[in-house]
Amino acid sequence: MSKEKFERTKPHVNVGTIGHVDHGKTTLTAAITTVLSKHYGGAARAFDQIDNAPEEKARGITINTSHVEYDTPTRHYAHVDCPGHADYVKNMITGAAQMDGAILVVAATDGPMPQTREHILLGRQVGVPYIIVFLNKCDMVDDEELLELVEMEVRELLTQYDFPGDDTPIIRGSALKALEGEAEWEEKILELANALDSYIPEPERAIDQPFLLPIEDVFSISGRGTVVTGRVERGIIRTGDEVEIVGIKDTTKTTVTGVEMFRKLLDEGRAGENIGALLRGTKREEIERGQVLAKPGSITPHTDFVSEVYVLSKEEGGRHTPFFKGYRPQFYFRTTDVTGTIELPEGVEMVMPGDNVKMTVSLIHPIAMDQGLRFAIREGGRTVGAGVVASVIK
């Protein structure tokens, strides 16, 4: 049987379910695939198909994640659901499944719970741009006032973490009843799909973003000058473009006089391609791995930042012992390690393997970074943690 061709005709959007344990995230995921397949085509996925999520490795970290897909008339969605709380934490921090928006599931019978709060906070830290709320199990709550109270609590919680709580779409539904095919509750799933379509803007594709190439290697070619190689992270680079070399040393400007791929000259290099860029008037020793080539003014170098970090457990090959303030590991950004020191939040004395923690990092060299950049924490080449830049300090 030949594989079905992947249709690129519709915009592709990445979403996922987040929220407290047993509030119905996986049931909702099953309900979305079931109801949408009935109305718009596509494959329905049963609860147990989603719940026994396969193990994946992202940056050496074991994560259980289920990936499903579904369609609305205007979009194609890739949706990620995790069985356990720890999987969510790891997933969001490593960016294993980047989300353009999240569906926060809150049981109307419980209201917001500790993990509801933690997932919203994580969403803020790791840069999930939009959250839509599905108030689940509404079939079990007869009291309209109680529903309004829960809704108000959720809005306040979102506002507390800088999401627009007052304007967030909140859909009242019952994932289980929708899954069982009850028409009035199926309608709520269609309402949710509609909210996804209208509230989450179409994500900007990597190719439309400002050019950035992490430098992996530098060569000097006699008679031609200096060539840097790497995989274009975003944007497009064309022969004749002015670029900045950012990170580690002072930022300098240069012009790209040639772009090549597999030793062939090209007019341009695009996001996702491995290229070599020939730089005008730049000496081999002025550039090193770990710097980036970037569109002028699009990214700046920084040493100090706030991050959200997951520390690998012993079973994942991480440390066997906790670390304390003053810990000095290497932080691996894109292509290189930079030593840094850490500050722990007030009241946190130590961090155990398997924990996640907010920490402030100070690097010995500046690195080109902005919010959302992922990194690994390493000791002597061994990965012991994964993190994401939540905000830049200086």
UniProtKB/Swiss-Prot annotation:
<feature type="binding site">
    <location>
        <begin position="136"/>
        <end position="139"/>
    </location>
    <ligand>
        <name>GTP</name>
    </ligand>
</feature>
<keyword id="KW-0460">Magnesium</keyword>
<keyword id="KW-0479">Metal-binding</keyword>
<dbReference type="GO" id="GO:0003746">
    <property type="term" value="F:translation elongation factor activity"/>
</dbReference>
<dbReference type="InterPro" id="IPR031157">
    <property type="entry name" value="G_TR_CS"/>
</dbReference>
<comment type="subunit">
    <text>Monomer.</text>
</comment>
<feature type="region of interest" description="G4">
    <location>
        <begin position="136"/>
        <end position="139"/>
    </location>
</feature>
<dbReference type="InterPro" id="IPR050055">
    <property type="entry name" value="EF-Tu_GTPase"/>
</dbReference>
<feature type="binding site">
    <location>
        <position position="26"/>
    </location>
    <ligand>
        <name>Mg(2+)</name>
    </ligand>
</feature>
<keyword id="KW-0378">Hydrolase</keyword>
<dbReference type="InterPro" id="IPR009000">
    <property type="entry name" value="Transl_B-barrel_sf"/>
</dbReference>
<dbReference type="InterPro" id="IPR005225">
    <property type="entry name" value="Small_GTP-bd"/>
</dbReference>
<keyword id="KW-0251">Elongation factor</keyword>
<keyword id="KW-0963">Cytoplasm</keyword>
<dbReference type="Pfam" id="PF00009">
    <property type="entry name" value="GTP_EFTU"/>
</dbReference>
<dbReference type="InterPro" id="IPR027417">
    <property type="entry name" value="P-loop_NTPase"/>
</dbReference>
<keyword id="KW-0342">GTP-binding</keyword>
<keyword id="KW-0547">Nucleotide-binding</keyword>
<feature type="region of interest" description="G2">
    <location>
        <begin position="60"/>
        <end position="64"/>
    </location>
</feature>
<dbReference type="InterPro" id="IPR000795">
    <property type="entry name" value="T_Tr_GTP-bd_dom"/>
</dbReference>
<dbReference type="GO" id="GO:0005829">
    <property type="term" value="C:cytosol"/>
</dbReference>
<dbReference type="GO" id="GO:0003924">
    <property type="term" value="F:GTPase activity"/>
</dbReference>
<feature type="binding site">
    <location>
        <begin position="19"/>
        <end position="26"/>
    </location>
    <ligand>
        <name>GTP</name>
    </ligand>
</feature>
<protein>
    <recommendedName>
        <fullName>Elongation factor Tu</fullName>
        <ecNumber>3.6.5.3</ecNumber>
    </recommendedName>
</protein>
<dbReference type="InterPro" id="IPR033720">
    <property type="entry name" value="EFTU_2"/>
</dbReference>
<dbReference type="Pfam" id="PF03143">
    <property type="entry name" value="GTP_EFTU_D3"/>
</dbReference>
<dbReference type="GO" id="GO:0005525">
    <property type="term" value="F:GTP binding"/>
</dbReference>
<dbReference type="InterPro" id="IPR041709">
    <property type="entry name" value="EF-Tu_GTP-bd"/>
</dbReference>
<feature type="binding site">
    <location>
        <begin position="81"/>
        <end position="85"/>
    </location>
    <ligand>
        <name>GTP</name>
    </ligand>
</feature>
<feature type="region of interest" description="G5">
    <location>
        <begin position="174"/>
        <end position="176"/>
    </location>
</feature>
<comment type="function">
    <text>GTP hydrolase that promotes the GTP-dependent binding of aminoacyl-tRNA to the A-site of ribosomes during protein biosynthesis.</text>
</comment>
<feature type="region of interest" description="G1">
    <location>
        <begin position="19"/>
        <end position="26"/>
    </location>
</feature>
<dbReference type="InterPro" id="IPR004160">
    <property type="entry name" value="Transl_elong_EFTu/EF1A_C"/>
</dbReference>
<dbReference type="GO" id="GO:0097216">
    <property type="term" value="F:guanosine tetraphosphate binding"/>
</dbReference>
<dbReference type="InterPro" id="IPR009001">
    <property type="entry name" value="Transl_elong_EF1A/Init_IF2_C"/>
</dbReference>
<dbReference type="Pfam" id="PF03144">
    <property type="entry name" value="GTP_EFTU_D2"/>
</dbReference>
<dbReference type="InterPro" id="IPR004541">
    <property type="entry name" value="Transl_elong_EFTu/EF1A_bac/org"/>
</dbReference>
<feature type="domain" description="tr-type G">
    <location>
        <begin position="10"/>
        <end position="204"/>
    </location>
</feature>
<dbReference type="InterPro" id="IPR004161">
    <property type="entry name" value="EFTu-like_2"/>
</dbReference>
<keyword id="KW-0648">Protein biosynthesis</keyword>
<comment type="similarity">
    <text>Belongs to the TRAFAC class translation factor GTPase superfamily. Classic translation factor GTPase family. EF-Tu/EF-1A subfamily.</text>
</comment>
<feature type="region of interest" description="G3">
    <location>
        <begin position="81"/>
        <end position="84"/>
    </location>
</feature>
